Amino acid sequence: MKQLTGAQIRQMFLDFFQEKGHAVEPSASLVPHEDPSLLWINSGVATLKKYFDGRVIPQNPRITNAQKSIRTNDIENVGKTARHHTFFEMLGNFSIGDYFKEEAITWAWEFLTSDKWIGFDKELLSVTIHPEDEEAFTIWNEKMGVPKERIIRLEENFWDIGEGPSGPNTEIFYDRGEAYGNDFSDPELYPGGENERYLEVWNLVFSQFNHNPDGSYTPLPKKNIDTGMGLERMTSIVQDVPTNFDTDLFMPMIGATETISGEKYRNGDLEKDMAFKVIADHIRTVTFAVGDGALPSNEGRGYVLRRLLRRAVRYSKKLNINRPFMFELVPVVGEVMKDFYPEVLEKKDFIAKVVKNEEERFHETLHDGEAILAEVIAKAKEEKTTVISGVDAFRLYDTYGFPIELTEEYAEEAGMTVDQEGFENEMEKQRERARAARQDVDSMQVQGGVLGEVKVASEFVGYGTVATESNVVALVKNGEYTDSLQAGEEGQLMLNVTPFYAESGGQIADRGYLLADGVKVLVKDVQKAPNGQNLHKVVVEEGTLTKDAAVKAIIDTKNRGSVVKNHTATHLLHQALKDVLGTHVNQAGSLVTSERLRFDFSHFGQVQADELEKIERIVNEKIWESIDVEISQKAIEEAKEMGAMALFGEKYGDVVRVVQVGDYSLELCGGCHVDNTASIGIFKIVAESGIGAGTRRIEAVTGKSAYELMNDQVGLLKEAAGKMKTNPKDILTRVDGLFAEVKQLQKENESLAAKLSNIEAGNLTDSVMTVDGVNVLAAKVNVADMNNLRTMMDDLKNKLESAVVVLASVNDDKVNILAGVTKDLISQGYHAGKLVKEVASRCGGGGGGRPDMAQAGGKNPAQVEEALAFVQEYVKSVSK
């Protein structure tokens, strides 16, 4: 067996399958862009679903990839076991209806055992198969020469995730030797059992059935291969180390942590070893996730990152690290992964800034949170309970930023548990935000549909043409082929030549008409068909449309003209955002319509008003410079060398379309654009907002829409100036003057209210009653708010010197209640807080406060008199 680095194993795997005719699929972003069912990309096949379910036909049915992945369903096990990770790489080879079992098994065996590749000793490999998969048994036994005693039949060797492709699988195991297990009485000591000796190297899934919605299984029209090999586990075997953490994929981070902490890994302290592992794992995950656009927050993906960072900081204390340090490990991760993921080093400064910011925030609250938790645990032990209440756990989460998982880990160390149900009840809406994570499900659609069978060519000519003669080459109604569509019917069609742009890259589809003698067809929408053709959604307005009919295809040029202005403006906006906010800004989504543009981008803070103004000014300056927009076809590598921005979630071929706006903006883009920026006219931002963790949104208008917006705003300004009897240019001065007048009137009103309050307080002293020797005043008064009520209370307490006073007022069906007790009566047991709570409860409210002064509110004005009558009862109850 060769001595290889993790990076060499990854590259060797891809090279091997490239030699076998596979296309190398780039590793996709960890943040899914096409699959709303996933929180993270969590497997090698997750990004290929569109191929397996037939929505998209790949150029090459043989695919291989090394896909970065995140799984967070067992975070608490990371560091405790040899192979649990939150971030990992899955190496895979896939066949979309091409080769099947024999090739998959043969190639796997060749890669693992050939001296040209990994070079495993064949005698150390065993396999598992499904009990009924005789074909796999025959291939392994007769062709590969694996003895039948090393071919183990297991019922669980069937891959099934619900609806969609399913089938038997075979797994390959490597025997690491007796040092990892030699007790043959152990029922788990076999390939496929829970043990450290026989490690799974590779899982080959043979997708040959559709699991239908009714629970039945039918053969797939096209059989598929889906395989997965964990790079970290494979590296641990090749490098002959006890755990994945001891490989060169993790040791640089562990080594850097040793330097920072002064502690040593594998120095006989298992708790410290666990801390090293947790830190190494979590910094890999956070580094890659932030690099792909996720940012720490209290919801969804952001909550996962926050939880991982805070868990790592908590474990760092076991290594005597009491300062932010994780950010220092970001460039270490970048160096380890630079061969295949150079973007990590390119973004290291931004990633480190995000990590450091989050660490600093947590350190600010961690000390207080730990102290409070220690008190909670001590109190629970005094009360002889082993449960931390949900209320206390929630207070730690809400006030001190303590993730519930950390509270649970601390509790476990103290031999206690947390009342999870109570915590969840306390979370209410906050819990919904924190847990608003989409489920890590992994499902595919059932294969089928006639559109995937349509191979006929369709040429898009809409970049330079708005109308063209064409022929209907495919016609579909209700999911089935048809020869015609009658007036009033809807359907889908393909043209051999089309000027209609299919929705993609954020740009909406063209609309327009297909015309022929006696036939008028409205084109409502255009999308990409599975094999890449433009698929037109149509309604026949007049006549009958037939397959093979000759038509004139005409797009709505007014609509297209507005769309292209907005699309080119998004390119200018993207670059302006980078110029003003920083190079960390990346497009996270966009929508380009004829009315407006919407641009989503990564940024971990609100865009300030002065920044928005600067961004808007830059875009308009580029418009007014009348810059030519040049579009060219380039080899992908040449385009990247030019500095063209490639966008997350987009797939690019070997030749790409480059859109260049002078020397200012350079992007890979398949959309439609203006010829010169002057055509855009003007650009106006209408809104900026946050739409999720670390993602901001700008909405803007251009051209006619921008003119109409500003014209409306000028109209409103003139109308407002008219109402204020001034000129638009003087309106700010007039507004300032009005504010000053209002402020003066408020001051005069408060002075008058205080005088009236003093007068009314004097009149109220005549209503004082004596109850068991105590002066008691309970009255409904006419004051505007709680402030006036307090002023009156102070006057009454000063005048009466010794009294229990309760005042109530009603404004807009809202009841304000204030209770006061003079100092001499507090010592006798009278308590304003307790009294006001009882009074408020009798008119549908609640409240409380100090012994001398307390306030409350009520919801039922009709019950105020009855509530005030209780004051005498209260005084009597205390005097007893």
Swiss-Prot record:
Catalyzes the attachment of alanine to tRNA(Ala) in a two-step reaction: alanine is first activated by ATP to form Ala-AMP and then transferred to the acceptor end of tRNA(Ala). Also edits incorrectly charged Ser-tRNA(Ala) and Gly-tRNA(Ala) via its editing domain. InterPro entries: aa-tRNA-synth_II/BPL/LPL, Ala-tRNA-lgiase_IIc, Ala-tRNA-ligase_IIc_anticod-bd, Ala-tRNA-synth_IIc_core, Ala-tRNA-synth_IIc_N, Ala-tRNA_ligase, Ala_tRNA_ligase_euk/bac, DHHA1_dom. Zn(2+) binds at residues 567, 571, 669, 673. NCBIfam families: alaS. Consists of three domains; the N-terminal catalytic domain, the editing domain and the C-terminal C-Ala domain. The editing domain removes incorrectly charged amino acids, while the C-Ala domain, along with tRNA(Ala), serves as a bridge to cooperatively bring together the editing and aminoacylation centers thus stimulating deacylation of misacylated tRNAs. SUPFAM superfamilies: Class II aaRS and biotin synthetases, Putative anticodon-binding domain of alanyl-tRNA synthetase (AlaRS), ThrRS/AlaRS common domain, Translation proteins. Its main location: cytoplasm. It catalyses: tRNA(Ala) + L-alanine + ATP = L-alanyl-tRNA(Ala) + AMP + diphosphate. One of its GO terms (biological process) is alanyl-tRNA aminoacylation. This is Alanine--tRNA ligase. It comes from Bacillus thuringiensis subsp. konkukian (strain 97-27).
